[in-house]
């Protein structure tokens, strides 16, 4: 079915768009042209205190080789050592699987092609891949040697990660509509009704959510396990929730007065037959995402910046209600 095909290809498509990426490498081919054409910024000194706590290298080559070795080994502790405490959030998005995939992408691009460019006598950057994608964290020369300047790359890395994660969240919202249509094509509980799934994860032994484990030869469930695990409210322990490319997701079973048709409960006689909606919010505001998104079966996705208290604000959203402050995603 068309819906199953799109659902099954969601994860690789999302990975191509933006894998909650450390060092912004998953989308190297997308951003290379713009980044390469941007004028080089003037060298900015790393603070003496920060430089003193960072490992230094005799040459830029040695520094970048140490980085690649850490990424190749998936050595998170070594990455933390190279970039220091201030750079820790730059290499950890909160989604370990996506981070590891991004590190592997970096290494593959590096192995295919790489070059070091001297932006000044005391500043060097690494470009990788056939598109010569520039790594946003340069090496700068200090009294002790060459060190990674995480301050220089901070804003750029976070901006790229957020941009990709938000594109992912939008794509998930659109795929969610197909998943629910797929789900509703079959009577999943034997009550004679075609209903939407009221939750992401099915109860053990049931098909009352978008995801359930399957055996070899069985048709896949509409959603994959990683997306299903991205709902902290429905899991027994919040620590078990894993953001899906930097975002959490929750199904909504009502709509408010600002939705088409006005306020209504999608449940009729306890059965979810009148519609369904989805809410997506960043796991870490300003680190994994900025915008919160919501969509319904009408096919429209809306976005809004809920601010620093996004998690608390999202927890209060119980209905699809794109009122003032919510903008349609084009």
Sequence positions of predicted segments:
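N-terminal secretory signal peptides that target proteins for export/translocation
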Residues: 1-13
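Short, well-ordered alpha-helical segments enriched in acidic and aromatic residues
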Residues: 75-87, 193-197
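Bacterial N-terminal signal peptides
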Residues: 14-29
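Short beta-strand edge/turn micro-motifs at domain boundaries
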Residues: 124-127, 131-167, 171-174, 300-305
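Surface-exposed, charged secondary-structure patches
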Residues: 87-135, 238-245, 249-258, 263-272
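C-terminal soluble interaction/assembly domains
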Residues: 274-330
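Short, low-complexity N-terminal intrinsically disordered segments enriched in polar/charged residues
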Residues: 36-73, 117, 153-178, 182
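Flexible, glycine-rich surface segments
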Residues: 183-287
């Amino acid at each position: 079915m068309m819906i199953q095909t799109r659902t099954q290809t969601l994860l690789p498509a999302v990975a191509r768009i933006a894998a909650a990426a450390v060092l912004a490498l998953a989308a190297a081919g997308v951003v290379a042209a713009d980044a390469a054409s941007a004028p080089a910024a003037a060298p900015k000194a790393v603070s003496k205190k920060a430089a003193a706590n960072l490992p230094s290298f005799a040459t830029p080559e040695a520094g970048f080789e140490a980085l690649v070795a850490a990424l190749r080994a998936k050595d998170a502790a070594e990455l933390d050592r190279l970039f220091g405490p201030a750079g820790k959030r730059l290499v950890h998005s909160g989604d370990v699987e996506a981070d590891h995939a991004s590190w592997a992408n970096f290494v593959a691009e590096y192995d295919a092609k790489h070059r070091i460019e001297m932006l000044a006598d005391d500043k060097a950057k690494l470009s990788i891949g056939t598109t010569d994608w520039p790594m946003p964290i340069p090496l700068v020369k200090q009294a002790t040697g060459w060190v990674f300047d995480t301050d220089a790359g901070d804003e750029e890395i976070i901006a790229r990660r957020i941009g990709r994660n938000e594109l992912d969240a939008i794509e998930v919202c659109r795929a969610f509509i197909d998943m629910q249509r797929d789900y509703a094509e079959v009577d999943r509980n034997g009550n004679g009704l075609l209903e939407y799934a009221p939750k992401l994860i099915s109860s053990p032994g049931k098909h009352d959510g978008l995801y359930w484990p399957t055996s070899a030869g069985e048709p896949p469930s509409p959603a994959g396990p990683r997306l299903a695990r991205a709902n902290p409210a429905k899991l027994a322990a919040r620590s078990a929730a894993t953001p899906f490319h930097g975002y959490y997701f929750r199904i909504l079973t009502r709509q408010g007065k600002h939705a088409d048709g006005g306020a209504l409960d999608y449940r009729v006689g306890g059965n979810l037959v009148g519609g369904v909606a989805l809410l997506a919010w960043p796991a870490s505001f300003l680190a994994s995402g900025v915008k919160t998104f919501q969509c319904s079966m009408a096919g429209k996705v809306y976005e809004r910046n809920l601010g620093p208290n996004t998690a608390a604000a999202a927890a209060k959203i119980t209905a699809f209600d794109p009122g003032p402050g919510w903008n349609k995603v084009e």
